[in-house]
C-alpha cells in the first residue's frame, strides 16, 4: 500500500474542510454494503466518519468515501478495504509486534485482512465519560451498541497534537468493521500542524460516538465484560481541548465534533471458526494490561477503523512517548495501525481520553471467558508534555472490558496503552491454538519512555482456513503502582496456517520488550498474529494496540456506516530522495520543454515516492504517507522528531525519521523498535499472508520450532513497515533503530517476516527460517523483560533494544524472536502461565537493568555521546560482536542451505543492524537506556535480524534480555535459555543467533539499513562520523559475509570458542553460564513449549556453535585461543604496528584513545567462528572493557603484550596520517569469511582503506558497499597495513563504490608495509584454518612475506601507493580528445594566463617589471640528445642583465583556459644566496671533497643508456663525481639513523683513496699503494676526518637554513608539502631553524647527469639547486667551458611572454637567448659498455660459486647488513657482494672487519658509491685471493685495486632511481668501517693479483665524430637549457620533469667549474625506517622472481650439479655404444614428479 503522506501543516483548515465536503459528497454516492452473517462472521463494511476537532474550535464533519475493498492480492487494496481490525494498534511507528506481527501506523497488510474473518460490529453502548476524565467539552454521539454476540469492537482513536501550539491535535477516531474477505482494515494517519489527523477506517456497521466532557478525561467507562466485571474507575489525563474524536455512523454523513469526546468503536471480526456467535469470547484467555499512566497517548489513531477515545490513546502514549525520545508531548502521536504508521508517519493522535472511553465503550461481551477481566488503571499521566494525556487513565477502574471469545479465537483487542517511563503496562492474552488460554505477558521496560510494541495491531490477518483464529481485543490496564513500565501483550489471533504477516507497513517491530505473543509460545497462535503497536514517547506520540477480536455473535446488529471518506490530498514529495534534492530543472524532459503548457514537475526532479502510484487503500493515507520524515514544516511529532533529532541524540525520533515511500513497501519502520525492514519495498507491500510465504523464501525464516511453539513472539516482520512518524516516535528505542530498519529494511528481504506475525501461527522452525535460522528469540517472559520489546529481541539477529521506551524490534527475517514457544524466557520469573511456556504478566517481570554484560553499557552510550559515535556505529560494533559470536548458530542444517540462509541472513543482519543502530541511537538519546537500552535497541531488527553485540554481545544480549523482559536474575536468564529461549541465551551468551547464516543476511540488511539511515534519517545524516560508520558498515558487511561463511563453518566454529563470545562471556559470563546451561538442553523444536524451543535453538546454535555452547566453549576456546593467540601474537607482533596505526586512525575518528580497539573489534567479530576466536577472547576482553562495549566484544585476539611490542615497532611518524600508533595495531584479524574459517588476517593502516576480506553474501556485500560508502571511507585512501594470510579477518568497513570492500578483503589478501598496501588473492592455505588462530607464527609470517613478494612481483597496479600523483584538476576546457602532453603539477605555481603567472611571481618576489622574466616553453615529448644519447642544449637561456632577478619558465597547456592553463615549470633566482657565502662555500666544499673524495655515488645517470660515453671524463683523478649527504634515498642505508647503521654519519667523508672507483673500474687504473697506505697510516687521520665532516655538515646545514625561507617565498605550496610532517624524522632534516623542507643534499662536482627524473623524491615536492661557479666563470656571461641545466623534452616557444615574435628575436639578438646549431666534434667512447657495479665481481664469483653464497654467512654477522644486502640487491641493482667485498677486501685475514662491513654493506650498493679507497676496496673483490673469496663471498666483489673494479658498478640508487641525479646510494656506513679495516691487509699484493686477469677485459676507448645534426634540424626535439650563475638558486619539480646537465669538455673534480648542491626530500622520509622495509620486500620479491627461472635451469647447469644430486641414472655405469641406450628398464617408461629430471 502506498503510504499516504501527512497533509502539509501549512494547509488551511478551510481547504481541508472543503476537500472533506467534496469527499463526503462522493461518500454519499458510494457506500459499501455491510455484510451481516448471523451464523457467519461478517464485517460491516460501513466505516465511521472521522471527526476532527480543530484547535480553532471549528467542527467539521467529514464523510469518508468508502474505500474500495482491495483484492486479496493487493496490499494497497487490503489496506484500504479494512482499517477495522480486531486488534487494537498502538499507532506507533515502532509498532507493537505480537505473534510475529508488528503493528505499524500503516494499514493492515493484505494478508492480515485476508486472514481475518468477517466481523459484525455492533454499536457500543455509550458510556458517559467520568467527570474526572476530561475537562474538554465532548460532543456525544450515539455509540454503537454491541450485541451480546458481538465480540470486541475495535476501537480507533486518532489524536494529533499540534506541536507548534503545544497542543495536541484533535484526533479523529473512527471505527470500522471490515470483512475479512475485503482485507485488513487500513488506517490512514494524517498529521497536520494544527489540524487534527483524520484516519479513515473500514466501514463500520455502527459508529460509536463517545461524549467526552471536560478537557481532561479522568475516567473512561469501560463496558462490563460478559462476566459483568468492571474495572475500577481510573483517572484520565486531561485530554487536550483540541483533540476530539467523533464517530459518525455511516447514516450520518455529517461529521460530528466532540471537543474532548472520542468515539470508540469496536469491531468484531467474526471468527472463521464455525461458531458464528460469540463463542469466540470464551476462547479469549484472561488478559490483563497494566498501563503505566506515564505512557503518553497524545494521539490515538483508530486501528482497524475502530475509534478509540483520545484519552485512551493519549493515556497509552503518555507513558511511552515522552521519555525515550525526549520529544515534545505535542509532537508525540499514536498511530493505531501499522499501516497508519506507515501511511501517516506525521499523524499525531491525541489519546487524552481515548483509553477511558475506549474501555468504557468495550461491550460487556468482551469479557474473556474464564479470563480475568482486564482492569485498566490509570497510573497517572505518562505524557511528558502537558498536552500528553498519557496520564489520562481513560478507563474507569470500575469499568471492565470483558471479551468473550472462542478459545480457538485469539482475542485481539485494539488498545491504546500509554506507557509511562516508569510505569509498566502488562497484559496477558490467551494464546490461540494449542494453548488458547495461555496468555503472553510482555514487559515493556522503558526508562523515561515507553517502548512501543507494534503487534500487527489491527493487522493480524486471520487466515480464513483457520476458523479458530480470531483476534480478541485485549484490555490494557494501566497500573499506577508499577514503577516499571511493562507491557505484556499476548495478542495472538490463532491462524492455523501459521503466522500471517501484517500488511506491508503493518508489520512492525515491537519496540517494547513484549513477548508479543512469542512469549505465549506454548500456545501457538498459528492463526492471526495480533499486533500491538506501542509508540515510544519520542518517536510516536500515540500508541495503539489492536488485537483482532472475533465477533462471537453474528447476531450483533449490523451497523450501517458510510464508507469513511478518504480525503485525497496532494501527496507531498519526500524531500529526501535524490530527485527532491535537485533544485534546478533539467530542461531536457518533455515537461521542461513544454513548461508553458505543462504543470508537471521536471521528470528528473519528481520525487521517487510520488512516482509510485498510491495504493488503493492509501487514499486516505496518501496524504500522510508521503510525508517527508526530514521536513519539519511544523513541530509535528513525526517529521519534527525525525528531522530535529541528531543521529546520536537522546531522542529516538531522530533515528526514526526516515523517508517513507508511498507504498507500504517504501514505508519504513522508522520508529518501530523492532520493525523489521524486511522486505521494505518488496515484502513491505506484501500482505501478511504473502509476507508469510515470502519470508521463509527470503532469508528471514522464523525459527520453525520457535514460531510454531510461540507464535506469540512478536515478530516485527512488517512487510512494508511504514510506521508513521507517530509510530516511530512511539517506539522510543526503535526510532533510531527503526529508522535504520526502515531505511535498511527496505533492503531487507525478510521484511514481511519482520512484520509481527502471530507467533502462535508461526512455527518456531518457520520463524527461525524467517530469521535465517535464527529462531526468533523473544526475550524472557515479561517478568524478565523490562520492556516487551526486549523480549522481542531476536535471539541471533536482534539485539535487545533496551532502554526506556526503547522497544525491541523483531524482524522476522533473521530476527531471533521467540514465538510462544519462547515465552518461558519471558516467564523467567514464575508466572501464572502454565509451565512458564506463556510469558508471565509484565507485572511479575522485575524491571531491572541488565546485569553484568548488559548489552548496552553506559560506557558504550557515553562513547557514542562523548566519542560522537553514531548509533549506527555503536550498533554496528555490537552487531559485529554479536555476529562474531552468533555465526556458529547461523549455520543452516545443510551447508548449501546454510550458504543460502547465510546470504539471506546477511541481508537480515544488515537490516537488523540498521535497526540496532537506530535503537542504539535512541538509547544514546536516552541516558537511562544506555546501560540497557543500547543493546536492546540494538536488538531491534527487521525480520532479518542481526544481533549486534555491544562490547559484549552476550552481555549485551543479557542486558537486553534482562532489561527487556529477561529476568534480571540469572535464574530468569536460565529460564529464558531453558524455556526455549536459546536465542536469548545466545544473546546472553553473546548473541549466538547472529552467528547463524541469517546473521549474514541481517548484517547485510543492517548495513543497508544503516546506509538508508545515514542517507535518509536526518539523525543518521547528522552523524559526522560517516567514516566511522563506513568502517562499521564495512565491518558489518564483512561480518555478514563471515556469518555466511560461518553458517558453513559454524560447525567448525562450535569446536572453536568464539573470541567475541568469550569476551562477551566475561562480562556476561554468569548470565551466559546460566543461559548456556539451559541452552544445551534446548533442542530445535517447533513446539511452543519454552524448553523445546530452547533445545531447538540450542541445536541450531550447536550447529553454528550455539551461544550457550559457545559460552561453554569459551573457556576451552580461550585455552585454544591462547594457543592460537600465541601464534597470532607473534603475527600481531610483526604486523601490530601497521594494524595499530590503522586502528588508532579509526579511533581517533571515533575520538577514542586506543584506535586498535576498533580494528580489533572488526577482527573479533569475524574471528568468532574462525581462527581468531580463541586468540582475542583470552586477553582482549579486559582491554576491550576499557573501550565502549562493542569494541570489547569485537576485539579478538589482542594480546596486550603483543600490542605493547607492536607499539614499539614503529615511530608514530612512520605514517604521517596516523601520528599515533596503537599497541595492538600489529595484531592480525581473522575473519570467517567466505566459508573458510581461516582467512588472511588483515591489519589496516590508518591510511589504508580496510577492504573486506571475505566476500559477504551478495546482499551483505552490496549493503556493505552502500554502508561502506556511507560509513567507511574504505576507499583506497586507507591502506591496509597488512593481512596475515593464515588468520582471516573480516575487512571492514568501511569504501564501497569500489568492489565491495568486504568482498575485496574477503577475496583478497591485503598486505601493508610502510605505507604500501598490497592486495592479493587469498590462498587456499590462508583461508584454510590451520587452527583457531590460523597457521603458526612462522608460517603466518612466511605467508605474509610470500604474499607481499607475490604482490610486489606483480605489476605496480598491485601496489596501492600511500600518495597519488597529482592529476589534472577537472575543468570545462576543451582539452581535445588526446591526452594532455606533459606532466601536470601546480605546486610551483599556475595561472589562467602568462600574465597571471607574472603577477603571481611578482607578488612572491616583491618586485615588478624587468626584475621578473617569463619564458614560454613548449612540451614536445621528444628528447633532445646527441647521437650517443648524451644531453644536448639547443636553446640556452641566460641572464639578460643585472636588473633581471628572476626568470620563470612556464608551459601553456594546449586548449586550456582554466585557472591552471599555464603552469610554472622552473624558477631561477639569479641572486639566490649572498655572493660572499657562495664564495666561501665553494672554497670549503671543494677542499673537503677534493682531499677525501667525499663519498661518491655511482648513479644510473652517470652514463648513457649504452654505458659507453665518457661524459664524466677519463682521468680518474679529475673525473666528475657526485656525493650524497644527509638523509637521502641513496644514503638511507648508511647515512640515516633509521638505515640500520649504528653510527650514522650523514656527512661522512671517505678518505680512503682519492680516485673515483667508477673510473678505476672503467680504466683498470690502480693508484699506487703507497698513496693509499700513506693516507691510512696517518695516526690523526680519523680525527682529521671527523673535523672535516663537521665542517662539511656545518656548511650544508647553514645553506639549507638559508634556502628554506627562499624556497618558501618562491614556491610556498611545494614548501608546505615538504614541511607538513616536519616533526617526523626531525633528526634527518637539514637546517638549523624551524621550517626544514630538505632531508638530503647531493653535491655534483663537474658531474654530467644524463636525462633522468628523481623518482624517489617526495610527491608534490620540489628540488632546490644551488649553483657555485669557479672563480674564472663567475663574472663572464659566456665562459669557455660551462655546464648547463637542460630540459630535454621542451623547446623554446616562438614568441615571448607577450606573444611577440619580435620580442623573442630581440632576446636572441641581445644574448639573453642563445640558439645552438649542430657541430661535429671528436669524442671518445668505450668500445664495450661499462659493466654495472659488481658485474665483474659476479663473473668472478660465478667461477667461485661458494664466494657469492658464502656472503650470507658473513652477512649473518649483522642481520641488518643482511637486510640491507637483500634489499639493495633487489631494490638496487647493486650487488650485495660488491658492497661487502669493499669492506672485506681490505683484509683478507680480517674476516671480522669484513663481517662488520658486510653487515652494513650488505645492501648491494655500487662500489662506486664507496669513497676512494673504500670504493676501491669494496669494489675489488679480486683483492682477496680466490680461496678467501670462496670463504668470504662478500669479498668476491672487486677491490679498488683489482681489475674487477674496472667494471663500473651500478649504484643501487642508479639502478633504482634510473637516472635520478638526486638519488645516489652511498655506501653503507660500514664502508667506513671497511676503510677503518686494516688497510695493509687490504692493500696486500694478493688482493691486487686477482685484478690482473681481468685487465684484458677492461673496456677500451675509441674515437668517433659526434653528429647531432638531425636533432638540431628538427624543431620537435627538445633541449631548452638554462645557464645558472654563481649563487643562483633553481627550483624545479625533478620528480616530474626529465632533466639533465651537460658535460664539460675537461671536468676537474679537484677544482670543479660548477658545484651543484641539490636539496630535496626523499619520498620515504616520513615512513618507518624511511621505507627500508618496503625496499627489503621489493628486493626479496625480485630475488625470488630471479631465482625461480634459475632454479628451473639449475639441474642442467653442469654435470657436477647432476652428480651432486646423485641421480641414479647418471651414476649408473653404462657401456659406450653407438646406439642410444637408456638406463631405464623399459624404453617407454616416463617418470613423473620431481624425479623426472633424473631420467
UniProtKB/Swiss-Prot annotation:
One GO term describing the cellular component: Sin3-type complex
Interaction with DNA, as annotated region: 1528-1541
Region (Disordered): 1-79, 119-168, 227-286, 613-670, 711-735, 820-859, 882-906, 964-993, 1050-1129, 1209-1240, 1322-1341, 1734-1760, 1830-1901
Outcome of swapping residue 1652 to Y: Loss of catalytic activity. Does not affect chromocenter clustering. Does not affect interaction with DCAF1. In isoform 2, does not affect localization to heterochromatin in late S-phase
Amino acid composition bias (Low complexity), ranges on this chain: 884-894, 1748-1760
Known cofactor(s): Fe(2+); Zn(2+)
Main location: nucleus
Bias-annotated ranges (Basic residues): 1-19, 1094-1116, 1734-1743
Highest taxon above the source species: Eukaryota
Protein name per the record: Methylcytosine dioxygenase TET1
Organism: Mus musculus (Mouse)
Originating gene: Tet1
